């Protein structure tokens, strides 16, 4: 890593979602992968990265699953109340980070992305700090992209050379991201990820190319693929 000054980063994991598309008996972050929940894999991967000091996880009040996890007793894992929308949950985490002065920088990571690699996190940090106000991991679109009509017919083909899939982590300064999210929520703006809130303030976050296998579990078939990737990552670290 090219950074020469000491750096500490807090990871924020919004984990208050229901994940209805999984059609499971519990939220997708609590489904099992290789004997552990998806959330455990995700948080453990973040905690194992040297620059991450704490993981602030936003959980729905009354969540019956999180307290049963071993990592719930880890003093590096901080639980805060999650909100109705992703932005509310992230803002709750940011409030804790600011109140306790945990770090100048935060990175927000999806609870359902357990396959993020340390090499990608390292690349994100190295390319974003200190030259940019923030940035995200992203993957270039490889497929031909079609714009559809309301009747689901093809209206036109979109130039994919300028399109990227937004991934996580997304890395920003604590103060800027808090201000962006709070402003967006106050104005009832559409905030789909942290970067979109920053963009609405007129900034252009850095795109850092990450691996496409940093998948987000959203469909039942994603579990098998995530399990394969996790096993592959484990073999590569031996």
From Swiss-Prot:
Which residues bear the site annotation Positions MEP for the nucleophilic attack?
Answer: 160, 216
The feature of type site (Transition state stabilizer) is located at 21, 28
What is the top EC class of this enzyme, as a single word? transferase
A GO BP entry: isopentenyl diphosphate biosynthetic process, methylerythritol 4-phosphate pathway
Specify the pathway. Answer: Isoprenoid biosynthesis; isopentenyl diphosphate biosynthesis via DXP pathway; isopentenyl diphosphate from 1-deoxy-D-xylulose 5-phosphate: step 2/6
Q: Which Pfam families match?
A: IspD
GO terms of molecular function: 2-C-methyl-D-erythritol 4-phosphate cytidylyltransferase activity
Q: Which reaction does it catalyse?
A: 2-C-methyl-D-erythritol 4-phosphate + CTP + H(+) = 4-CDP-2-C-methyl-D-erythritol + diphosphate
Keyword set, alphabetical order: Isoprene biosynthesis, Nucleotidyltransferase, Transferase
Q: Which domain of life is it from?
A: Bacteria
Enzyme Commission number, as recorded? 2.7.7.60
Sequence similarity: Belongs to the IspD/TarI cytidylyltransferase family. IspD subfamily.
**Functional summary from the UniProt entry:** Catalyzes the formation of 4-diphosphocytidyl-2-C-methyl-D-erythritol from CTP and 2-C-methyl-D-erythritol 4-phosphate (MEP).
Its protein name is 2-C-methyl-D-erythritol 4-phosphate cytidylyltransferase
């Amino acid at each position: 890593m090219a950074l020469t000054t000491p750096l500490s980063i807090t990871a924020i994991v919004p984990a208050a979602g229901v994940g209805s598309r999984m059609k499971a008996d519990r939220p997708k972050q609590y489904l099992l992968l290789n004997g552990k929940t998806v959330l455990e894999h995700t948080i453990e991967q973040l905690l194992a990265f040297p620059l991450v000091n704490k993981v602030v996880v936003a959980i729905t009040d009354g969540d019956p699953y999180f307290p049963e996890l071993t990592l719930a007793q880890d003093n590096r894992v901080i639980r805060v109340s999650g909100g109705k929308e992703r932005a509310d949950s992230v803002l709750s985490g940011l409030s804790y980070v600011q109140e306790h002065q945990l770090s100048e920088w935060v990175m927000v990571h999806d609870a359902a992305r357990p396959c993020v690699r340390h090499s990608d996190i390292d690349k994100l940090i190295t390319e974003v700090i200190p030259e940019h106000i923030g940035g995200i991991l992203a993957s270039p679109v490889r497929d031909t992209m079609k714009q559809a009509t309301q009747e689901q017919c093809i209206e036109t083909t979109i130039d994919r050379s300028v399109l990227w899939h937004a991934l996580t982590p997304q890395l920003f300064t604590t103060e800027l991201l808090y201000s962006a999210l709070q402003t967006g929520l106050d104005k009832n703006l559409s905030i789909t990820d942290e970067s979109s809130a920053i963009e609405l303030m007129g900034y252009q976050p850095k795109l850092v190319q990450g691996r496409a296998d940093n998948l987000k579990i959203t469909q039942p078939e994603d579990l098998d693929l995530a399990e394969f990737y996790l096993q592959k990552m484990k073999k590569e670290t031996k």
